[in-house]
């Protein structure tokens, strides 16, 4: 069991039995063996734990405090909903029991535990949280970079990256939004905007991602925001977007990053319809190196899609948006959170099966299929139909694709995770061995010595022509923190800020052009 639940003892069990839980994303019913403990911990398992052994890793991990229960008998008999306040948001989980008696037993147990813990805790700290259960999403990453460097005849196997770790410079809280001039909107999402800005003191251009704290809390995305901050700071690689600053304002979280003014790869593919196999091979090789680096640091990316692949002004890949990353997942480890973009989800994620880092290689298969075929491998207007296609439909390829390309895509888009290309312990190296990549010079690719097949025609450093005009034509302004004229009360303000106590502000010294030095012996990293 994970360390966060190591304190749980079997004598603290209040109730345990089989229940059916309704999925939060795919709204089907799933049997789980649930155990409720005195401290409010509610664990769900795919099978009943053995009595003579320690509890295994749970599939579901809830914390129920100050909870309310509601009984329902439609659309199924013996249903009940557990509601709990997480800061300003009511979180609901829906269950049904096999009988009315079992339902009543669970409701009484939940109410008893809730009443007991309500007396012990401040109501402002009550929550009901469901997390991934393998790893610690709120803990600091503890990554071993002491990989032994070995060389072989395989060019990819001997690719060594000597990465300069970013230097965290102690400084006072002097970085604020007032330090930047906002120029153009580059993108907008549910949680905020990405804006092209110029730092007043250095006159340098950056892309600043500004996230509304209120939206992060309302959507229960605090943990993902903290993860993005840690990953951005910890990871330095030529094909990952690099962080310059991260800080928080009163109502916003801000990430100041390098500006990749070549725009989204999605935009370029829309204009070209398809990419040649050679161009796809170039982008694919840079993506593979970047994902191999993340996996070596025990990070699963989980959000591979064309919209998250940018080009710099020279035409090299920059992967962006690390909010869905999962830390502390090494080879053999699995996690279970349903997350990602529907069209890019691996079958095991859709089917609610614990998954490993090979979900990233499925995502690579989807984006490379799009590049060469000009369309998604599976598409439908309704998610239900889309998920059915992803999990059951055979792949189809245009006749013009080479046998090497078909073999590569078939391997990456293998539905059985254990058989998927890249699923073994060799990870990225296994993908690199595909015949499709036989002519790739991996060391030269890493050093950016391979000429990109396409260089964006960027007219100036502030040219945003490769970004969606829907966004670049927007006025540069931030969304007010609250709807209406009402100002937050002191309690509400403290409640909001308490969510971000663990958010560390970072300042990376030096130029963002730094990333690796092939002559350094320190910090060697080998994709193995």
UniProtKB/Swiss-Prot annotation:
GO (cellular component) term, any one: protein kinase complex
Cofactors required: Mg(2+)
Family matches, as CDD domains: PH_PKB
SUPFAM superfamilies: PH domain-like, Protein kinase-like (PK-like)
Positions of the catalytic residues: 303
Enzyme Commission no: 2.7.11.1
Sorted UniProt keywords: ATP-binding, Developmental protein, Immunity, Innate immunity, Kinase, Magnesium, Metal-binding, Nucleotide-binding, Phosphoprotein, Serine/threonine-protein kinase, Transferase
An example Gene Ontology molecular-function term: ATP binding
Biological processes per GO annotation: determination of adult lifespan; innate immune response; insulin receptor signaling pathway; intracellular signal transduction; regulation of gene expression; regulation of synaptic assembly at neuromuscular junction
Domain comment, as recorded: The PH domain binds to phosphatidylinositol 3,4,5-trisphosphate (PtdIns(3,4,5)P3) resulting in its targeting to the plasma membrane.
Assembly notes: Interacts with pdk-1, sgk-1, akt-1 and daf-16. Part of a complex containing sgk-1, akt-1 and akt-2.
The protein's name: Serine/threonine-protein kinase akt-2
Gene it is expressed from: akt-2
